[in-house]
């Protein structure tokens, strides 16, 4: 499981012209792009949620748990794209939807159980993600 985390001052996910999840402007939060591979499980999702919730990448070396920063979770199978051969990525390392969707949901639910305010994109949908990266700070978490 890979989580590409971006510190943001605002972000939103749009599906079919509708905003389905957002971090309001001028609110420091985290955008978590979540990729799932074949051997991931519920424990990895939980451990990564705990790691993200306590990761000190916000202002003044604070974590989301320290300041109650909102987290926007968006599924992102392309995090497992392989570009070593040719000019077209392959997605073989990405878990199929029936495997990945419940694990992305478990990740978001684990964050909520830790006390996070979580919004999400729509799994498998064509999404437009808008964000204002703060810093910029971008970190890759992986287990």
Curated annotation (Swiss-Prot):
Identification of the protein by name: D-aminoacyl-tRNA deacylase
Entry-linked SUPFAM superfamilies: DTD-like
Gene Ontology annotations for the cellular component aspect, listed alphabetically: cytoplasm
Family label: Belongs to the DTD family.
EC class (word): hydrolase
Subcellular location: Cytoplasm
Its job: An aminoacyl-tRNA editing enzyme that deacylates mischarged D-aminoacyl-tRNAs. Also deacylates mischarged glycyl-tRNA(Ala), protecting cells against glycine mischarging by AlaRS. Acts via tRNA-based rather than protein-based catalysis; rejects L-amino acids rather than detecting D-amino acids in the active site. By recycling D-aminoacyl-tRNA to D-amino acids and free tRNA molecules, this enzyme counteracts the toxicity associated with the formation of D-aminoacyl-tRNA entities in vivo and helps enforce protein L-homochirality.
Disulfide cross-links: none
Motif Gly-cisPro motif, important for rejection of L-amino acids, chain ranges: 135-136
UniProt keyword terms in alphabetical order: Cytoplasm, Hydrolase, RNA-binding, tRNA-binding
Domain notes: A Gly-cisPro motif from one monomer fits into the active site of the other monomer to allow specific chiral rejection of L-amino acids.
Biological classification of the source: Bacteria, Bacillati, Actinomycetota, Actinomycetes, Mycobacteriales
The EC number(s) this enzyme carries: 3.1.1.96
Matches recorded under NCBIfam families: D-aminoacyl-tRNA deacylase (TIGR00256)
Naturally occurring in which organism (per UniProt): Mycolicibacterium gilvum (strain PYR-GCK) (Mycobacterium gilvum (strain PYR-GCK))
Record-linked InterPro entries: Daa-tRNA_deacyls_DTD, DTD-like_sf
Residue spans crossing the bilayer: none
A molecular function (GO) term: tRNA binding
Subunit structure, interactors included: Homodimer.
GO biological process, one term: D-amino acid catabolic process
Catalytic activity: glycyl-tRNA(Ala) + H2O = tRNA(Ala) + glycine + H(+); a D-aminoacyl-tRNA + H2O = a tRNA + a D-alpha-amino acid + H(+)
Pfam assignment, any one: Tyr_Deacylase
